[in-house]
Regions:
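Short pre-catalytic strand/loop immediately N-terminal to key active-site residues, enriched for Gly-Thr
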Residues: 10-16, 198-212
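Conserved phosphate/ATP/ADP-binding segment of small-molecule kinases
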Residues: 120-197
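Phosphate-handling active-site elements
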Residues: 32-36, 198-199, 225-239
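Conserved N-terminal subdomain of the carbohydrate kinase-like
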Residues: 2-9, 29-112
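N-terminal basic/disordered segments at the start of proteins
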Residues: 17-33
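Charged C-terminal helix
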Residues: 4, 55, 233-269
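Short, small-residue alpha-helix embedded
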Residues: 145-146, 208-232
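Nucleotide and nucleotide-moiety/phosphate-recognizing core
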Residues: 89-97, 186-189, 195-197, 228
Length: 269
């Protein structure tokens, strides 16, 4: 049996390569983990916009999940873009049948350019079917508000939102502060709530548009570390360092919200 850690991403494809499945697999590779994938949607997008979304038929999603379960030893996996309530319920049903290890749920709802990636009707399905299965959830501020109704602006409101999510079954909540209305602040703060501890992670806030795929990359790095057997707290801290390096060393690709730099963290080591 191989000693190489294996991880899975269940998400949408980004033709521009900056987010989704493409960002996840790049991150897995950079963190020394063999990556597998289940594609839930094919998007036509670049750094400027999302032009088309084609959701994958449920039977094809089920077949992909079975193919991975039958042949790979997955020790951690992440879920990104699912798009519809039907896909959410399809994936949740499969997760009750197959064991893929620790689940990191990135509740993808809106693309960096503003295009919706999750139907509003699917938010209830996300809360009902996937939150109880999640070991870690990584919402940004708009996603945290959509899931809980709480507008996170400080430590107190972050704790309120986290308590709601944990009451629904999530073990660890990471609320990402990059979308803060106080974006003039020089610091970007994330709030972390585990079953036994709570703490914040801070990094410089960079004035850059090269942030496409940051959420995908952050959760993918966390998933890769968990696949290697790292503790949840250490996986979160490594993911924070990884994405900070990726944002602070932009590639300047494209004419809009450009992708992050997946080589940056390794190059600084």
């Amino acid at each position: 049996m191989s000693k190489v850690a294996q991880a899975l991403t269940i998400a949408g494809s980004d033709s521009g390569g900056g987010a989704g499945i493409q960002a996840d697999l790049k991150t897995f590779q950079m963190r020394g983990v063999f990556g597998t994938s289940v594609i839930t949607a094919v998007t036509a997008q670049n750094t400027l916009d999302v032009f088309d979304i084609h959701t994958i038929p449920l039977q094809t999603i089920q077949s992909q999940l079975k193919a991975i379960a039958d042949d790979f030893t997955i020790s951690a996996f992440k879920i990104g873009m699912l798009g519809t309530a039907e896909i959410i319920e399809c994936v949740a049903e499969a997760l009750n049948q197959y064991h893929f290890g620790t689940l990191v749920l990135d509740p993808v709802m809106i693309a960096k350019g503003g295009a919706p990636l999750l139907q509003q009707s699917a938010v209830d399905s996300l809360n009902t079917f996937l939150l109880p299965l999640a070991d870690v959830i990584t919402p940004n501020l708009p996603e945290a508000k959509a899931l809980t109704g709480v507008e996170v602006i400080d430590d107190q409101t972050a704790q309120q939102a986290a308590q709601i999510l944990q009451a629904r079954g999530v073990k660890t909540v990471v609320i990402k502060g990059g979308h803060s209305a106080h974006s003039q602040s020089a610091v970007c703060r994330d709030w972390v709530f585990t079953p036994s501890a709570q703490f914040t992670l801070e990094s410089p806030r960079y004035a850059t548009a090269q942030t496409h795929g940051t959420g995908c990359t952050f959760s993918a790095c966390m998933t890769a570390e968990l696949a290697k057997g790292v503790s949840v707290e250490q996986a979160i801290k490594t993911a924070k360092d990884y994405i900070t390096a990726a944002i602070s060393h932009p590639l300047n690709i494209g004419h809009g919200h450009g992708p992050t730099n997946h080589w940056a963290y390794q190059n600084k080591m």
